[in-house]
Amino acid sequence: MELLRVENLCKTYGSGETAVHALDNVSFSVGKGEFVAVVGSSGSGKSTLLHIIGGVDCPTSGRVFVDGTNIYTLNESKLAIFRRRQVGLIYQFYNLIPVLDVEENITLPLLLDARCPDKAQLDELLGMLGLTDRRKHLPNQLSGGQQQRVSIGRALINSPALMLADEPTGNLDSKSSADIISLLRAFNKKFHQTLILITHDHDIALQADRIIGIEDGRIMKDEVIRR
């Protein structure tokens, strides 16, 4: 069943001779529970694509459907609710609040949405993240890999249908990178959440169900990984 559909997506910065076409007529769809890796060189349009899918940046033209809704027909208030409740964003930089402990950083999206954390859900999430004994630690008391686990927890606390990860292992060593990808894959499988991950690492991309290659704002390949 389809969760995401991107139709004729274009994004242009500037105008005239100085215009930069970050995305040029991009179209594809992703099924519920699918794990898709998006690869391409720096400046190819990968991050722009992810931000538009997540409702963070607006397209110049084209449409993005998530679970049947064209998200760019929503007003600002409804689009903000969509971002909070339907999308989990994970970045290369952890963006944790330094004065909040692990538990507080993870549950922050719920509080911003005027909802109370469910203790059983939080305990299960902390356990899966391997952070149960770190729940009261501040970010500066954690390793880079542990901080990225917190950012993953923060992205997952709302049980989003769509997880978007932009180079989530970019600041980590090889072991921590492998652990993070395994963790994302585990959540993808356990909760049947759709995962779109940007990476420069070919070995990481091969762990996905499918690889989409982008260059100069266009899809150059779209292939299913056969195992």
What kind of feature is each model-predicted range?
Residues 2-214:
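ABC family nucleotide-binding domain
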Residues 211-223:
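H-loop (His-switch) and adjacent beta-strand-loop-beta switch element
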Residues 226-227:
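ABC ATPase nucleotide-binding domains
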